[in-house]
């Protein structure tokens, strides 16, 4: 099945297993990896990212912004972190503070974002795509992001040591197999893709 679906992508001008990172590739890979077992689809083109819980027989949908590759990886990371109960709620039942957060709100944001961004870093490393932490506060960017960068970087290394299972790891392996042609993960990939502010 995988070869057939990647062939379909190739007919539309998107080459699988190349340095080109397309959301169409991610959608196909996500479907192959998770659609059947978790009844979840990856959907691009949203003005804002959003998770729509399964309802009335419809699958759950992970909506990512526009056609942004990193947005797709980031939203998949949130999905991988969310437990069974959270995945039954729209946007996982979280309240989101928009741009313009004050310093205290930004610190709270960073606390809850370390884990998903650590997974996102591993996803980027697995497919050879540049990674930079997202402060997600364009109106009031903090002057120093180094503590947050360090926390994300260290959490990613911890995940490599302690969590070789679950949806996050399954996705890392799928990406590495597709983009790097190996099911293994090389720790140096993290340093290769990590970009400091």
Regions found by a protein language model. Name each.
Residues 135, 139-197:
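Pan-zinc metallopeptidase signature
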Residues 59, 81-114, 133-142:
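Post-HEXXH active-site segment of zinc metalloproteases
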Residues 1-56, 106-111:
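Auxiliary, metal-adjacent structural segments of Zn-dependent hydrolase domains
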Residues 110-126:
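An active-site-proximal "capping" alpha-helix that borders the catalytic cofactor pocket
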Residues 122-137:
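Short helix/loop segments within enzyme catalytic domains
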Residues 55-71, 106:
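Short pre-active-site segment immediately N-terminal to the catalytic Zn-binding motif
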Residues 70-83:
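Active-site recognition of the HExxH zinc-binding catalytic motif
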